[in-house]
Amino acid sequence: MATKKTPRRTAERILESSLALFNRFGEPGVSTNAISADLKISPGNLYYHFPAKDDLVNALFAQYEQALEPVLDAAPAVAHVEDAWFFLHSLFEVNWQYRFVFRNLNELLSRNRLLEARVL
């Protein structure tokens, strides 16, 4: 018997695929149709969960902030070179995971006022 995918899982899959595609090709180089095709879902299904591409970007940025928070919280505990190395490694690891943000930051901020308000 086939298991039914829950709407929450579909939204998670959309975000995972979007992140991978945005990181690989840059956010401007990825259409919602490309994301739908990658997931083998209809564009309407994608738009049900994320009505606009900026909604995807905002959701991914929220994930980035969540991933970054524990790393930044550890900063005051850095007392030795080894701690600093680990802190920087962790910081760069999170930034690499969401590298599309930095790749196209100016364009994202000029188009997306919600993101601009969160960043600036």
Each PLM stretch: what is its role?
Residues 13, 21-55, 59:
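Helix-turn-helix
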Residues 1-9, 20:
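N-terminal intrinsically disordered/low-complexity leader segments
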Residues 62-68:
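Short, basic, alpha-helical segments at the C-terminal edge of helix-turn-helix-like DNA-binding modules
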Residues 59, 73-117:
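Hydrophobic alpha-helical connector segments
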Residues 13, 67, 83, 87:
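Charged catalytic carboxylate motif
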